[in-house]
């Protein structure tokens, strides 16, 4: 029987959700409506008694104080138009899943596989009479047609009947059908097989696969296990997933022919040469002070925290799915990187999340090309996805930022990070080490497998185009995942498994295939995998990226205890096969072999890409900019720029207090609304030792030179980290590259230049990580961040997020960015140069410029170490980094965050004498920090920084006003802090 429960607010109860929808429709679509009311709908398809449904409706599904509820009849007919939005068949419905569990508890029985609960939302409009307009509202504002469907009912019409046709159930039967694919065809046909199958395999890779399957020894081996010479769809899909750019990082592993003004050089793997090479050099220099435990070989990097605990950190990207479904893509991004942390070593407890987003302007007014969502819709969906992923998992989100550039309209960038801790030793063994053993059972825990996420790995290895698959979109379930994590930590502590990893890109194909490298093979029974619904073919079961799943190697003598504990904690665990030493990637379905690939071929057989690159410096020049007539107006304009303004409306949606460990929070100051440079987290309640996390990201400099963009991102991350108290003696970095396609082709005629940009960024990564003594412990690359449909192509600016994590010995010594007391002295550390290329000041005036900031690592490192000593001695009242907008913006932020003004004299800066006042104020020279110091500490501070660039430039004052004197002693800025703060808070206040 099918029931439809409708729940809505009683008369007189404010419908905040409906009012938000009305406002959004007005702002985004320009449609004025009288009012919007919302109802929650639960459609139940189960064998239940009427009383059971009534109890559910009046119990867990509604609040009788503020809500009305009806069963199988409309809640009201008082509307002009009704739009009901629900999920398409097969899309994860988290609320429906929770509702299903609630009813099961209520009636004390388990639903069958065919029974379920499906949720939807009704929007009831007053003042909407045009059905075409309603269709526009549904398709452009209320729903995402990729994952949702809707019905429209005009006032006076009857709602559709409640029957099987309204249930978004997946139809079809799971089948053992396996296709054989003939690869002995023309090159055009090989490319067609790759393209139509969404395999993202190149012609050379298709040739390699074809040649492998014509090898007589391979044919003989295949015949012995019941397979013919032709590749099966299961095998081809597994190869495509394993060889995808997303998983194999073929561009970073390529043989690069790089040409610049110094000549031609061959670089065998950017990753090995610059990233691994830098870390190897840093660790050698650290010698017995090396704190790295696990780098580049697990789901996340691991460093020491103290003698008893290890610290885990990873940052991922989830760009392509977020372009199609911002909410689901971002939610999957954060819960996915959570699994990376949990699945590192023998398993770690998650302590905090980070997030960094890159969007086009939410106020984008130009016409969008086909298949692109409006940047504001992406903004709102991504923020909500990360909010739900972190908040519902009980993990605080403590650090992040948002960058804006209209080139991110083609693909947004969604960086999600997570940190975790684990005991240094578990059962007498290092916790960061793990190894599956021959005979261990392959056990999958957590969620079930569905069509969601199929081809996610290969989809994210290409640009967004007409054929981008709907199935690549996933929606995570943080509650199911949290239950699984709690179970796994207990299983870890009981010693119930030998190894663990997450099911991310490529699903079982990736997780089991990678773990089997420990043993040399595996035997996987795909028909034993639990499914969300019928209708999946064997290859879909293998590569589905359905969320909330982990794969473990469980020894035979622990299997029963493991399965029993999982059942006790309401976590599904399935025995899918065994790890072997066979040398083969072996999958069966109903006892029949459907895939038998050499482990050596699937993991090492991909041909090395050949990547040509040629560096030609761009033709950029310095603009002839007149001195401002009103510096206060310019400063307010800069504070209101999207890349500088307050992101409080976003930050407030994240729980940064859960777990009670956040010491320095994302917002700080007298009113808790100033922008913190970094976050400080105390993970152990019996110790004052803390973790400091920060980041740097500078895409605006890429248009001039990606070498300096990378250097500035590293420096920005480190100075944010140091400003808050992070120790330069115990700090590690993570690099996350997001690039436009750098492979020369008809689609990318400027591939030589884009590849050279990539090389230069990697050169800087090596140079500055070695110079600063910062090892790289993990990272990721996303290399196809382009949109192309027809002749229209949008490529992102080359972007690298450089995340920094390390230690502060005593969180009580942490320093925040806000000024503290009138009378405190204001110092500027670091020299100010004429470096405004790519700056926010130039951007405000419509220019790019040429003088990109150049980082002097030698002086910066000395400065940062000295800042550490000053912090440890308690000499600094505040410390704030100078970044976008330079000194002017940093002064304003520190002042209005603390609630006190400043009197500043630009003549006191360490700068070229001829440097004009606007350039002194808005230069973005790197490695600079703004300090405030109590007068009694003046001598000590100046003694500490003796011989370095340390300028006393002013004082903190009682009056809430920023006053800046220019070169002739005349005040060029005298403006109330309230005006500056309002300019800074206004742009995104309502987002």
How should each PLM-predicted stretch be described?
Residues 33, 90-92, 112-113, 124-126, ...:
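Glycine/proline-enriched, intrinsically flexible loops and inter-domain linkers
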Residues 1-11, 38-43, 77-89, 119-123, ...:
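Short glycine-/aliphatic-rich beta-strand segments at the starts of folded cytosolic domains
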Residues 7-9, 43-49, 85-87, 123-134, ...:
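Short beta-strand-to-loop capping motifs
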